[in-house]
Regions:
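Conserved class I S-adenosyl-L-methionine
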Residues: 2-46
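Conserved S-adenosyl-L-methionine
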Residues: 52
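A short glycine-rich, Lys/Arg-flanked "PGG" loop and its adjoining helix->strand segment in the class I
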Residues: 127-139
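Class I SAM-dependent methyltransferase SAM/SAH-binding core
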Residues: 56-100
């Protein structure tokens, strides 16, 4: 992925298998992040890019609130799923990376949710994305995203015992999930996610790799990309970021 501006590995099973795509929102329920970003964007109509939109839940929410929304994701299966959801007609959907975004009017805000920023594995990936977002933002526009704070070491809970969950899907019935086998290579954490479909006994595995970047390094890269200012929060209530204790590293970057 060196030099690309993809925000999620489009070849991972999680993003390519239609059964797992359909389960994504069930396993990632809750809207604390969406509520936080929506409050930062405000109620006045804005032109918004949802970068790495996944199943499109937040993009549809923004469109329903009256915003002009373009949503992109490098995984066609995610975009196909998003297009079939209620309210999808109000959003412009594109299966592409940021560098493949067609020319158009600048955006007032770019959002990247779901810890998608951590799929940028190299310095080149991060820098290309930050510079690319800066280019498509209008003066005074904002880039809002989050990543996990490496100091808290969230991966230590990605064990079968601590990560086990289950959902009951109308299409698939009961499905269990757990993480296992995490490995650390510098700033990159690799792990597997295992799925068990009770209805037919199907077992699926998706391998993931995430980058954990320190706030100091990320702050410098944001400014180097041409942003004038950045505010850091440490949780979805808006508390200031504390490197020792904050689980989240939430950025509001001003162009």
């Amino acid at each position: 992925m060196t030099g690309s501006t993809a925000v999620a590995p489009a070849d991972e099973t999680l993003y390519t298998d239609a059964r797992l795509v359909a389960l994504y929102d069930l396993f990632n329920a809750g809207d604390h992040d969406f509520a936080f970003y929506a409050s930062r964007i405000g109620r006045a109509r804005r032109r918004i890019l949802d970068l790495g939109c996944g199943t499109g839940t937040f993009a549809r929410r923004l469109a329903a609130a009256g915003h002009d929304v373009v949503a992109i994701d490098p995984a066609p299966a995610m975009i196909d799923h998003a297009r079939r959801q209620p309210g999808a007609d109000a959003v412009r959907w594109l299966a592409c990376e940021l560098r493949g975004l067609p020319p158009g009017e600048p955006f007032d805000a770019v959002v990247m949710t779901g810890h998608a920023f951590q799929c940028l594995l190299t310095d080149d990936d991060i820098d290309a994305t930050l510079h690319g977002v800066r280019r498509v933002l209008a003066p005074g526009g904002h880039f809002l995203f989050e990543t996990r704070n490496p100091r808290v070491e969230a991966w230590r809970t990605w064990t079968p015992q601590q990560s086990a969950r289950r959902v009951d899907s109308p299409e698939s019935g009961i499905v269990e999930l757990h993480h296992a086998g995490y490995e650390i290579d510098g700033a990159i954490v690799s792990f597997d996610t295992h799925y068990r479909f009770h209805r037919d006994g199907t077992l699926l595995k998706s391998a993931s790799r995430l980058r954990f970047i320190a706030q100091r390094d990320l702050h410098a890269r944001v400014l180097d990309a041409g942003f004038s200012d950045v505010e850091w929060c440490g949780d979805w209530h808006g508390a200031p970021f504390d490197e020792a204790t904050s689980a989240e590293l939430i950025a509001t970057c001003r162009a």
